[in-house]
């Protein structure tokens, strides 16, 4: 039986003879159903029309994407033996070893089970987002709390926000030892790469409340890092990233609580 993949978000579902009646990920207000309605494909069909894009981002960090762009269009990152976030096209030629897969939030779960089976890897997902797993597997381990250590140099940090279990990965050895945050779009690097933003729903432009931004800001303030890599090839902050995230949180709070930055003051 095929494991159907949603064309709009890239989420893979448990094998079935017929496609699911809909995609809960896309029916949620944080995503959307495509203008042409619900459409499905499979990993096998995807391999016939798409290929992997692999690039070194910095020493020790490799980006993995899909071309032409498919679904949300994010790219994954490989560091040490960790695959951070996921892309729908599984390709065992792009990296040598994956022991652990960790994902920032459900929009990037995609084909995590296929990747885990191909590399004999475990998958770490925050338990707060358990309901969004569309293809259960014994390889999936749900972690709880605010932090989960993967190795001496890698740690998962729950930031929440976009999803309750929204996670970033702290890579302590990155940026020549100054520290890197792999953020997905939990911290969304915007077009002006001196800033990030935060949203409950990006495609539908639904903001987060002030209390959640203040909480996220407090967590970020406790971390040591100088660089951020977001979910897309061109979205990163090369230096002074922590200060820029904190400044971005302050700007966001000004905009939603006092109207500053919106021409209201």
Predicted regions span which residues?
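Amphipathic coiled-coil/heptad-repeat helices and related helical stalk/stem segments
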Residues: 72, 91, 108, 212-213
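Short, ordered loop/turn segments at secondary-structure junctions
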Residues: 106, 128, 233
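N-terminal juxtadomain amphipathic helix
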Residues: 2-60, 64-65
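Short beta-strand micro-motifs in enzyme catalytic cores
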Residues: 2, 60-62, 73-77, 165-167
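Metallo-beta-lactamase
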Residues: 2-21, 28-32, 45-60, 81-90, 99, 113-164, 206-221, ...
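Active-site metal-binding motif and surrounding structural segment of the metallo-beta-lactamase
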Residues: 88-125
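A glycine-rich, hydrophobic loop/mini-helix early in the fold
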Residues: 68-96
């Amino acid at each position: 039986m095929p494991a159907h993949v949603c064309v709009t978000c890239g989420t893979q579902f448990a094998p079935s003879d017929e496609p699911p009646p809909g995609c809960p990920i896309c029916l949620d207000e944080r995503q959307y159903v495509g203008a042409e309605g619900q459409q499905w494909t499979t990993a096998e069909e995807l391999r016939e029309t798409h290929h992997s894009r692999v690039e070194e981002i910095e020493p020790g960090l490799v980006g993995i994407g899909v071309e032409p762009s498919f679904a949300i269009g994010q790219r994954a990152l490989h560091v040490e033996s960790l695959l951070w976030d996921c892309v729908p096209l599984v390709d065992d030629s792009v990296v040598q070893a994956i022991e652990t897969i960790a994902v920032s939030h459900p929009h990037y779960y995609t084909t995590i089970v296929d990747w885990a089976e191909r590399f004999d890897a475990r998958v770490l997902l925050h338990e707060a987002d358990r309901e969004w797993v569309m293809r259960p597997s014994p390889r999936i381990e749900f972690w709880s709390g605010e932090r989960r250590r993967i190795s001496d140099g890698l740690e998962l940090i729950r930031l929440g926000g976009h999803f309750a279990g929204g996670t970033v990965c702290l890579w302590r050895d990155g940026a020549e030892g100054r520290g890197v945050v792999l953020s997905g779009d939990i911290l969304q690097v915007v077009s002006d790469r001196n800033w990030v933003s935060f949203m409950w729903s990006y495609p539908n432009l639904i903001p987060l409340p002030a209390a959640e931004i203040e909480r996220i800001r407090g967590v970020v303030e406790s971390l040591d890092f100088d660089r951020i890599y977001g979910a897309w090839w061109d979205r990163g902050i090369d230096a002074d990233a922590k200060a820029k995230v904190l400044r971005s949180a302050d700007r966001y709070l000004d905009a939603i609580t006092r109207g500053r930055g919106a021409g209201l003051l």
